């Protein structure tokens, strides 16, 4: 007669099982947060005239900026980022982090992995420069809102989520549309 007592999983089996967002390239993206500083930024005097303040608005690729701010041990109370929404549309900046069509296998992880790999080191560094009482605001569209929330929860902790602000898009369809209409972002 067979035993009805379940066999506990081996240590190696439980070590491989965990809950979290996983994608190809995640460990390399995590390592990018601690990569050596490759460029520096400087204050734009034309944009900084009549500014006798410690506050700053920095408009740049935020990865090298965050690397430098973290290296300087700078701390901020508010961080606002507006990353690419990964819509594939043509903008001044790259907004298509999807793998090339011939590389797609249709799996969810591969579809979004490049975008997630772009975001992770930036959020890790943002966490380093955010004060303990600080807030980070992230503008993101519907294409990556779920992934953004998962990565933010991983980096900052689920308990740090304060809320989601929604704004109504201009120019959305009427209520009599044939299909569901996305009215917010």
Regions found by a protein language model. Give the residues of each.
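Conserved Class I SAM-dependent methyltransferase catalytic core
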Residues: 110-166
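A generic secondary-structure signal marking the coil-to-beta-strand transition
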Residues: 54-56, 163, 185
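Polar, glycine-rich mid-to-C-terminal structural blocks
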Residues: 170-171, 177-185
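Short, solvent-exposed loop/turn and secondary-structure capping segments
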Residues: 88-96, 148-150, 164, 176
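Short secondary-structure boundary/capping segments
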Residues: 73-75, 93-99, 151-157, 179-183
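Conserved nucleotide-binding/hydrolysis micro-motifs of P-loop NTPases
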Residues: 84-88, 142-145, 169-172
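A general structural signal for short secondary-structure junctions and capping/turn motifs
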Residues: 48-49, 128, 178-181
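DnaQ-like (DEDDh/DEDDy) 3′-5′ exonuclease domain used for proofreading
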Residues: 1-81, 85-121, 125
